[in-house]
Amino acid sequence: MAEPGEGLPEEVLALIFRHLSLRDRAAAARVCRAWAAAATCSAVWHDTKISCECELEGMLPPYLSACLDHIHNLRLEFEPSRKPSRRAAIELLMVLAGRAPGLRGLRLECRGEKPLFDAGRDVLEAVHAVCGAASQLRHLDLRRLSFTLDDALVLQAARSCPELHSLFLDNSTLVGSVGPGSVLELLEACPRLRALGLHLASLSHAILEALAAPDRAPFALLALRCACPEDARASPLPNEAWVALRRRHPGLAVELELEPALPAESVTRVLQPAVPVAALRLNLSGDTVGPVRFAAHHYAATLCALEVRAAASAELNAALEELAARCAALREVHCFCVVSHSVLDAFRAHCPRLRTYTLKLTREPHPWRPTLVA
């Protein structure tokens, strides 16, 4: 009698299995010899997402361990408040550090609540170990890692990962511990870096000058998060520095996320006219109307995405209508307050590239769902 997978080529099985969860891949490998061979081939594991919430606990040896060498890009999710999930994530990272030459991309995501006063030293030590071993690492995304990142991690990446193309450190922590000096060392050690995510306090005039250097490879994305007290006290960045950076990298896109910790005077320092802002997220405790109007006047040629969290008002409606009339390149706009019908009409009329929006005319139960444009 023929085995269940005998009639399907291994490459077809691999194409199917690569979309399965870790637990389902393990189950598929037990069906028959053909499926076992396909489930453990490199094509299945090249891009892998692993959740430590349930599927990894107790499963690392021997099945996953045998396939780690095939992983090039890993997205690892875990829940730091649950000890089994956290332990499984750390174990996987430490094993990966011992066999990491082939790793090209690592993305870590925390789920659930982080325990109070948890510095995450055990998790960060595992990340250090991976960075120290993965000399071919090209992409490191720590935006969803809910622990304070520091200079030591950046310097480890600078020393050990010269091939880095992207590094995102702009996570949701309320303490900024990455100084501009370590970022400068990173830029010098990683000449191919083309995407960088930072808290505002980690950026400096010298960094903008380094990015604008004539021998610098094309730089595509700078994501800046302004969410902690250090960001509010950051030194101002002159508009002339942004002019020079934009001239050196005409395709540069900047993403700005402004959180309640930023007072009005700091918002004014951040929103410089020459910044090529492609995405602007405003969640301010003070005036939001002024920044929206500023964006309408200075970012019309570059702004593709806008997110606003503020109290509803006639002034905000008027500012949004002005922005809609000026920013024809907008592809998405999300306002988490009730807006007038004229605001909705303005975005529909003036933004032909709009693909998704959250513009509610009446209060609805949360979460508010966006509308997709056909």
UniProtKB/Swiss-Prot annotation:
Entry-linked SUPFAM superfamilies: F-box domain, RNI-like
Function of the protein: Substrate-recognition component of the SCF (SKP1-CUL1-F-box protein)-type E3 ubiquitin ligase complex.
The keyword Cell cycle is annotated on this UniProt entry: no
Species this protein is from: Homo sapiens
InterPro entries the record matches: F-box-like_dom_sf (IPR036047), F-box_dom (IPR001810), LRR_dom_sf (IPR032675)
Key words, A-Z: Ubl conjugation pathway
PROSITE patterns: FBOX
Subunit structure: Directly interacts with SKP1 and CUL1.
Domain F-box, chain residue ranges per copy: 2-48
Superkingdom assignment: Eukaryota
Alphabetical list of SMART domains matching this protein: FBOX (SM00256)
Entry protein name: F-box/LRR-repeat protein 8
GO CC annotations on file: cytosol
